[in-house]
């Protein structure tokens, strides 16, 4: 029998406190998603069909993290999800949605409803700005067959030229009491749009994770051989692709990674793996970040069904040992129950954590609401569950094309307590990590990694760590028993 190592998970270890002059409120949580993309908080929402679509992704990016839109949908639908995130706000919208004057108000309503916007510039066939259609123009219109050109606010409009700063734009909009400022070139061709909503959001969400154009960052999951999907997502403006598999150390994954890096300019996160060798091979093939975790998720049964995996603390430690030599970030995916688990993962050298169950219960997640015994819940399922596999994730478990009755699941379907908004959950997780860094005397995540020392604890130590000898009469927002 070949026993390679003693393997530990989050509940097996604790960090030892250190002398500290660092206050939790003063620490920096800035980190990296990939070698080229930063994060303002080290949190990623999982690419699961009950966790991340555009609403979760928008919420995560506004808070400084990022969401990974799942792939259990056709290419066009996934592209639309990415577009909704990229269009949700922007410093300057460089490719604004527009409409032609001969279109109907019904057409305009489809556009505004689909992209959740309150108005749209109107252009002619040459792209020249000729008006703008806003809520004010259509508020009392009941005949949706009317032409946009008959209802819109016509030129002259208050406009600005390419290169205007957001501060200058804000002053101009305030002066003229307008909510939308079209950006035009010297020939009056529409080149961009600035909205007062985006300026307000910049103030409301100062830590938002944005790209070079002021748009929220977002990632998307793809499967083996899905180069067409990857290309369409990159065209839509996705910031990073997640090449997602239950077994990231496979020939097909390595081949797909090499093909993507050869043909597209985009950062690729690859996983899932748990060994040094796998990490080395993925980095050699071009991975911009490595995702770690086989079987730690609450809804994953891989370790039981297949007898394969590794406890998450040891898995992170293995992969970080190799990835750190190449300055490649490691993402700890799965097994996070408490904010203390996040702190442990970061102290082990992970650059960020990917979260599923804790976000599945939020308002923004795509799971279904349900009431059970008088309490609110939301549905949550593993991507290896029968339901998820029949919707498109079977390739993640190397069962693509298998009839539904022949699938061998590696996950279950269940429910999790409703936990309010994404911002409420992230607030508690961030607060816990800040507290941990204060105990460790770490001003930033790098110092946490450099400073942290661990002790292995017994089952009695774990029991002592949890609430004991008392009945909880009022639940805490960050402790689930």
UniProtKB/Swiss-Prot annotation:
Residues the entry annotates as binding NAD(+): 244, 293-295
Cofactor(s) needed by this chain: K(+)
GO biological processes: GMP biosynthetic process; GTP biosynthetic process
Keyword terms, alphabetized: CBS domain, GMP biosynthesis, Metal-binding, NAD, Oxidoreductase, Potassium, Purine biosynthesis, Repeat
Annotated GO MF terms: IMP dehydrogenase activity; metal ion binding; nucleotide binding
Pathway(s) per entry: Purine metabolism; XMP biosynthesis via de novo pathway; XMP from IMP: step 1/1
The protein's Enzyme Commission number: 1.1.1.205
Positions that bind K(+): 295, 297, 300, 464-466
Catalytic reaction(s) noted: IMP + NAD(+) + H2O = XMP + NADH + H(+)
Activity modulation: Mycophenolic acid (MPA) is a non-competitive inhibitor that prevents formation of the closed enzyme conformation by binding to the same site as the amobile flap. In contrast, mizoribine monophosphate (MZP) is a competitive inhibitor that induces the closed conformation. MPA is a potent inhibitor of mammalian IMPDHs but a poor inhibitor of the bacterial enzymes. MZP is a more potent inhibitor of bacterial IMPDH.
Entry-linked InterPro entries: Aldolase_TIM, CBS_dom, CBS_dom_sf, IMP_DH, IMP_DH/GMP_Rdtase_CS, IMP_DH_GMPRt
Domain of life assignment: Bacteria
Binding site for IMP: 298, 333-335, 356-357, 380-384, 410
Domain CBS: 92-148, 152-209
PANTHER family: INOSINE-5'-MONOPHOSPHATE DEHYDROGENASE, INOSINE-5-MONOPHOSPHATE DEHYDROGENASE RELATED
Oligomeric and partner information: Homotetramer.
Family classification: Belongs to the IMPDH/GMPR family.
Name by which UniProt lists this protein: Inosine-5'-monophosphate dehydrogenase
Originating organism: Helicobacter pylori (strain J99 / ATCC 700824)
Native organism taxonomy: Bacteria, Pseudomonadati, Campylobacterota, Epsilonproteobacteria, Campylobacterales
């Amino acid at each position: 029998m070949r026993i390679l190592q003693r393997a530990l998970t989050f509940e097996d270890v604790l960090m030892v406190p250190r002398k500290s002059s660092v206050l939790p409120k003063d620490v920096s949580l800035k980190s990296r998603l990939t070698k080229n993309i930063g994060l303002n908080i080290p949190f990623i929402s999982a690419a699961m069909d009950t966790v991340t679509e555009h609403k979760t992704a928008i919420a995560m990016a506004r808070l400084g993290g990022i969401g990974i839109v799942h792939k259990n949908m056709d290419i066009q639908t996934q592209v639309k999800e990415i577009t909704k995130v990229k269009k949700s706000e922007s410093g300057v919208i460089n490719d604004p949605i527009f409409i032609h004057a001969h279109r109907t108000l019904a057409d305009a309503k489809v556009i505004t409803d689909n992209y959740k916007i309150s108005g749209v510039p109107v252009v002619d066939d040459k792209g020249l700005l000729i008006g703008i259609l806003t809520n004010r123009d259509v508020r009392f219109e009941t005949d949706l067959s009317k032409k946009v050109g008959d209802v819109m606010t016509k030129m002259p409009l208050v406009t600005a030229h390419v290169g205007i700063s957001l501060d200058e734009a804000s002053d101009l909009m305030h002066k003229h009491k307008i909510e939308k400022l079209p950006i035009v070139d010297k020939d009056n061709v529409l080149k961009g749009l600035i909205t007062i909503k985006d300026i307000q959001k910049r103030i409301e969400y100062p830590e938002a994770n944005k790209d070079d154009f002021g748009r929220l960052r977002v990632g998307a999951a793809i499967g083996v051989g899905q180069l067409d999907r990857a290309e369409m997502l990159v065209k839509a403006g996705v910031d990073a692709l997640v090449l997602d598999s239950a077994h990231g150390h496979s020939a097909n994954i390595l081949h797909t990674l090499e093909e993507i890096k050869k043909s597209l300019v985009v950062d690729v996160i690859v996983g899932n793996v748990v060994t040094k060798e796998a990490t080395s091979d993925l980095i050699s093939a071009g991975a911009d970040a490595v995702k770690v975790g086989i079987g730690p998720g609450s809804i994953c049964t891989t370790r039981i069904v297949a007898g394969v995996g590794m406890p998450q603390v040891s898995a992170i430690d293995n992969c970080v040992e190799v990835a750190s030599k190449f300055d490649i970030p490691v993402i700890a995916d799965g097994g996070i129950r408490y904010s203390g688990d996040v702190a442990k993962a970061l102290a082990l050298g992970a650059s960020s954590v990917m979260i599923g169950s804790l976000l599945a219960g939020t308002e923004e997640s795509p799971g279904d609401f349900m009431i059970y015994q008088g309490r609110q819940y939301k549905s949550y399922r593993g991507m290896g569950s029968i339901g998820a596999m029949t919707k498109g994730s079977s390739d993640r478990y190397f069962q693509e094309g298998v009839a539904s009755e022949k699938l061998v699941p590696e996950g279950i379907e269940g429910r999790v307590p409703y936990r309010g908004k994404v911002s409420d959950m992230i607030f508690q997780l961030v607060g816990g990590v800040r507290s941990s860094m204060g105990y460790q005397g770490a001003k930033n995540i790098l110092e946490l990694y450099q400073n942290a020392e661990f002790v292995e604890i017994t089952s009695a130590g774990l029991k002592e760590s949890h609430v004991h000898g008392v009945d909880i009469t009022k639940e805490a927002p960050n402790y689930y028993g």
